[in-house]
UniProtKB/Swiss-Prot annotation:
The keyword Repressor does not apply. Residues 47-250 are annotated as: Catalytic. The lineage of its organism: Eukaryota, Metazoa, Chordata, Craniata, Vertebrata. It is found in: Cytoplasm. Binds 2 divalent metal cations. InterPro entries: Calcineurin-like_PHP_ApaH, Metallo-depent_PP-like, MPP_CSTP1, STPP_CPPED1. Expressed in subcutaneous adipose tissue. A divalent metal cation 2 binds at D90, N127, H247. This is Serine/threonine-protein phosphatase CPPED1. The modification Phosphoserine is found at S2, S294. Keywords: Cytoplasm, Hydrolase, Metal-binding, Phosphoprotein. It is an enzyme of class 3 (hydrolase). Pfam families: Metallophos. Belongs to the metallophosphoesterase superfamily. CPPED1 family.
């Protein structure tokens, strides 16, 4: 990491936490705030999808560069500034070992360096970042490039947990890494219960479910029934209010008991009818309110008055 990166937005997660938010300063509720959530910039997918070769295609990503630049510009214009900008995985399209991976990574870093230095980045690993069947080597590459693959941090009395959801999809080549995350997660959820934090929020790439906890296994876009139910019950027991994810390239989601599952569409390639966009998430003492904006809407109009009123409420 260069000195410029160290002093800029790349406050990479290390030691399972995010130095941008010191726990000793952020453990108490201080009033409403908001953050921006994006997913799947996935440099290269638009071309790969258009040619029908998602495994090997993706040799162009100019569209994704322009879209991500538009997202960054829209975020930088916001006032007040968001507490952070989280990207929920699939940062690039080229899987580990595939052509163009290095070039896509460098181009995304270049675009993200333009994020206002006062807005830390929170980076979540996706299946394209570490592979559909991750290995110790692919996870290590992600950690070296972008920071820890799972970690927690506090902002104003709210506990945020970032998970590596690929460990729940296929940990067959790195079972010990999956076990380590499981143990860590249990410890973090225990802290959430004991501390009675204002809210607890989870970020992961693959959704628990797309609409319902009881939906069929999709074998790609959701976690298996047994895995999702086990995780969701753990989250609910610890008081987690909402899980945010990407991966689906469409907006979706549902509720299981008192746990909201929010699936946010992509900055990059759309697989449904949603526009390229970002989600504004407002955290108040009582609730978590979120709204998806197209990049054009957020660029031209900013955040709507009703959300701004919540942010400014004392």
């Amino acid at each position: 990491m260069s000195a410029a990166e160290a002093g800029g937005v790349f406050h990479r997660a290390r030691g399972r936490t995010l130095a941008a938010f010191p726990a000793e300063k952020e453990s108490e509720w201080k009033g409403p705030f908001y953050f921006i959530l994006g997913a799947d910039p996935q440099f290269g997918l638009i071309k790969a999808w258009s040619t029908g070769d998602c495994d090997n295609g993706g040799d162009e990503w100019e569209q994704e560069i322009r879209l991500t630049e538009q997202a960054v510009q829209a975020i930088n214009k916001l006032n007040p500034k968001p507490k952070f900008f989280v990207l929920c995985g699939d940062l690039i399209h080229a899987m580990p070992g595939k052509p163009w991976r290095t070039e896509q990574t460098e181009d995304l870093k270049r675009v993200l360096r333009a994020v206002d230095r006062a807005i830390p980045l929170v980076l979540v690993s996706g299946n394209h970042d570490i592979g559909n069947t991750p290995t110790a080597e692919t996870v290590e590459e992600f950690c070296r490039t972008w920071g820890d693959d799972y970690f927690s941090f506090w902002v104003g009395g709210v506990l945020f947990l970032v998970l590596n959801s690929q460990f729940y999809e296929n940990p067959s080549k790195c079972p010990s890494l999956k076990q380590a995350q499981d143990q860590w997660l249990d410890e973090q959820l225990s802290i959430a219960r004991q501390r009675h934090c204002q809210h607890a929020i989870v970020f992961q790439h693959i959704p628990l479910f797309l609409e319902s906890i009881d939906e069929d296994d999709d074998y790609y876009f959701n976690l298996s029934k047994s895995t999702r139910k086990k995780l969701a019950d753990k989250f609910i027991h610890a008081g987690v209010k909402v899980v945010f994810s990407g991966h689906y390239h469409r907006n979706a989601g549902g509720t299981y008991q008192n746990l909201d599952m929010v699936v946010s569409s992509a900055i990059g390639c759309q697989l449904g009818r949603d526009p390229h966009g970002l989600r504004v998430v407002v955290v108040t003492a009582e609730k978590i309110v979120h709204r998806y904006y197209s990049l054009d809407e957020l660029s031209e109009k900013g955040i709507e008055d009703d959300l701004m009123d919540l942010i400014k409420k004392k």
